[in-house]
């Protein structure tokens, strides 16, 4: 409900693949990835038109159930934390891989770009981008690769219309 009645927007929350939160990890053990983990994605639906989009700021891996959910979507905002899994280690700014932190990489055979390749999603926008990610640089080869694959890179003040 909005302040003056129904908002005309419905929100459906659903589990996305994730690792367990740090406070639930067992010391010295790989926490692994759960297909229905402790992270959520949202489908936001305009009740009047039926148009919708997905908002998934954190996702550990692309799974078949997630592929089925997103196939043919008009718009997906998706986890773009890292370009490559070992990015923070290679740059000397962290000691964990993206996977260890519960984030799928943009690139690679198991990355988001490859994972969305055959889903028929009309518009794909990377969000939640770490400051170590070279895709943030307009003239980087990584940015060119992402855009050539049909992805947009979110930016402060970006407005999106369905």
Provide a role label for each language-model segment.
Residues 1-69, 156-162:
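Core dinuclear metal-dependent hydrolase active-site scaffold
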Residues 37-39, 48-52, 60-158:
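Cap/insert and terminal regions of metallo-dependent hydrolase folds
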């Amino acid at each position: 409900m909005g302040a003056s009645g129904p908002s005309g927007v419905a929100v459906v929350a659903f589990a996305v693949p994730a690792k367990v939160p740090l406070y639930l990890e067992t010391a010295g053990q790989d926490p692994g990835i759960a297909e229905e983990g402790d992270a959520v994605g949202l489908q936001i639906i305009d009740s009047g038109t039926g148009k919708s989009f997905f908002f998934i700021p954190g996702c550990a891996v692309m799974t078949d159930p997630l592929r089925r959910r997103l196939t043919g979507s008009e718009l997906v905002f998706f986890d773009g934390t890292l370009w490559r899994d070992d990015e923070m280690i290679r740059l000397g700014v962290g000691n964990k891989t993206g996977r260890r932190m519960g984030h799928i990489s943009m690139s690679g055979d198991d990355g988001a770009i490859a994972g969305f390749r055959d889903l028929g999603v009309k518009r794909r926008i990377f969000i939640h981008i770490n400051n170590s990610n070279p895709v943030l640089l307009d003239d980087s080869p990584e940015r060119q690769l992402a855009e050539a694959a049909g992805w947009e890179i979110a930016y402060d003040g970006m407005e999106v219309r369905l």
